[in-house]
């Protein structure tokens, strides 16, 4: 039973004792006592007017009683005025009985009760009546098992039986000592490593080549941490075959071929399986194109094409791939057929169903010609100066050169291809200018006759090396 009262008086102050909740003052004896009320089912508000001629003061009392199964709380307030009429108003509040809520799983009576009318309730003796924990409840905490809330120490020490059972199970599991599951092994694993405790195998039997577990010959796999039969185990390794196969499959995964355009090799198929062209980038100003395959088509007939070279070009050496001969012709005069410009090299050159694509990278709009290396690989170079704009005399001279399938046409070759009847292979002939002496044709390997003075072409040296690159500068 805890009770307290407050007294408001206009003339004298009110003194409050925290240890003893009974107020003391000049009007202490005039305070009405709190009357306990029976437990109603609702909130009861009672107001009464009392006539008083000489009453000046107000009282406020409240009482709260906590028991095992019920909660009683009453609030009494009395306000008096010093007027002549002497009206006195008194309020009495009684809280509804709080029903207990089950807090434990075993069905024991536990309750959580709330009384919103009383300002504060003391949980235990010796604590202040009014709690200082703002915003938090200072009552009915840690209630379990139907204990009396008046003793906070007893309430805090009691726990639910379900929690006790769980703690007991954990303690039993920790106290149980695990042993090795190999037959005949009674090694206590309580002080062993966590790995061996978890898999219930001692360190000696985890590495043994053969153990008996449940009457069967087994061996412990240190990779998958399981016992396997001897047939499933690799005797040379410490892992089972399935684990090893998965490991090898991950290590031997086929890796995709990396294609780089620096100074590496890019292999692409331009024809079929019998023809393959390897392209190298970054090794020359415009790259080198080398054909490694020779067509094996048997009888294509005489495939002829007409070449027309500009006047500043000089006869070049024959490119000697196997069964591949093509030469360029220095011919003055008008161009017989249309000239192929640098942007036409991106097209496809047909060779009886097989196509090859000549790559053009940064070719100078003026000209790009083909010069032969010692190994026969054509080299794309840039014309350093193209100063000739003079027109030569009209001349209708054509050069026919036999090209076998699989050869790569020079980039500035003018292809006006016509398929004729099969002819016997002959050496490539180059027509001379009509104005030069000695008329007729000259064979490969002979030095070409000099041109006349009007169209004398002087070869210039390439800045990169000391050999002539096959370009001419006209005077």
UniProtKB/Swiss-Prot annotation:
GO molecular function: DNA binding; zinc ion binding
Motif interval(s): Bipartite nuclear localization signal: 237-253
SBP-type ZnF: 177-254
Keyword vocabulary terms for this entry: DNA-binding, Metal-binding, Nucleus, Transcription, Transcription regulation, Zinc, Zinc-finger
Low complexity composition-biased segments: 51-73
Binding site for Zn(2+) 2: 221, 224, 228, 240
Tissue: Expressed in young panicles.
The organism's place on the tree of life at top rank: Eukaryota
Induction or repression: Negatively regulated by microRNAs miR156b and miR156h.
Residue ranges of the region described as Disordered: 49-73, 437-475
Compositional bias (Polar residues): 465-475
Binding site for Zn(2+) 1: 180, 185, 202, 205
Gene Ontology, cellular component aspect: nucleus
Cell compartment(s), UniProt: Nucleus
Known function: Trans-acting factor that binds specifically to the consensus nucleotide sequence 5'-TNCGTACAA-3'. May be involved in panicle development.
Domain remarks in the Swiss-Prot or TrEMBL record: The SBP-type zinc finger is required for the binding to DNA.
Designated name of the protein: Squamosa promoter-binding-like protein 12
Organism: Oryza sativa subsp. indica (Rice)
Lineage: Eukaryota, Viridiplantae, Streptophyta, Embryophyta, Tracheophyta
């Amino acid at each position: 039973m805890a009770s307290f009262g407050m007294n408001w008086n206009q003339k004298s102050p009110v003194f409050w004792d925290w240890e003893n909740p009974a107020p003391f003052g000049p009007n202490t004896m005039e305070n009405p006592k709190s009357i306990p009320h029976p437990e109603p089912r609702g909130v009861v508000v009672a107001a009464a007017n009392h006539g008083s001629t000489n009453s000046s003061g107000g009282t406020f009392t409240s009482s709260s009683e906590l028991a095992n199964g019920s909660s009683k709380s009453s609030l009494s307030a009395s306000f008096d005025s010093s007027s002549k009429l002497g009206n006195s108003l008194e309020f009495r509040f009684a809280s509804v009985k709080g029903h207990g809520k089950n807090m434990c799983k075993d069905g024991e009576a536990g309750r959580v009760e709330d009384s919103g009318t009383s300002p504060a309730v003391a949980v235990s003796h010796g604590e202040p009546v009014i709690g200082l924990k703002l915003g938090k409840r200072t009552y009915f905490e840690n209630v379990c098992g139907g204990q009396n809330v008046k003793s906070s120490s007893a309430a805090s020490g009691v726990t639910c039986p379900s929690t006790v059972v769980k703690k007991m199970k954990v303690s039993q599991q920790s106290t149980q000592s695990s042993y090795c599951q190999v037959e005949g092994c009674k090694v206590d694993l309580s002080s062993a490593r966590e790995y061996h405790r978890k898999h219930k195998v001692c360190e000696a039997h985890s590495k043994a080549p053969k153990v008996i577990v449940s009457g069967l010959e087994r061996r412990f796999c240190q990779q998958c941490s399981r016992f396997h039969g001897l047939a499933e185990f690799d005797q040379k390794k410490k892992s089972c075959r399935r684990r090893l196969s998965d490991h090898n499959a991950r290590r031997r995964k086929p890796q995709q071929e990396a294609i780089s355009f620096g100074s590496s090799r890019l292999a692409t198929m331009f024809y079929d399986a019998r023809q393959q062209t390897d392209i190298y980038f970054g090794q020359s100003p415009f790259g080198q194109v080398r054909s490694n395959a020779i067509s094996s088509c048997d009888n294509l007939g005489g495939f002829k094409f007409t070449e027309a070279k500009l006047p500043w070009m000089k006869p070049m050496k024959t490119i000697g791939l196997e069964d591949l001969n093509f030469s360029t012709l220095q011919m003055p005069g008008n161009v017989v057929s249309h000239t192929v410009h640098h942007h036409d090299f991106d097209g496809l050159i047909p060779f009886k169903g097989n196509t090859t694509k000549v790559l053009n990278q940064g070719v100078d709009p003026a000209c790009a010609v083909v010069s032969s290396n010692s190994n026969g690989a054509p080299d794309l170079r840039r014309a350093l100066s193209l100063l000739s704009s003079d027109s030569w005399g009209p001349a209708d001279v054509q050069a026919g050169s036999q090209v076998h399938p699989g050869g790569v046409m020079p980039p500035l070759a003018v292809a006006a291809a016509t398929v004729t009847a099969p002819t016997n292979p002959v050496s490539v002939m180059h027509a001379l200018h009509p104005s030069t002496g000695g008329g007729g044709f000259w064979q490969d390997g002979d030095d070409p006759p000099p041109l006349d003075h009007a169209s004398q072409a002087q070869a210039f040296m390439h800045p990169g090396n000391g050999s002539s690159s096959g370009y001419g500068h006209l005077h």
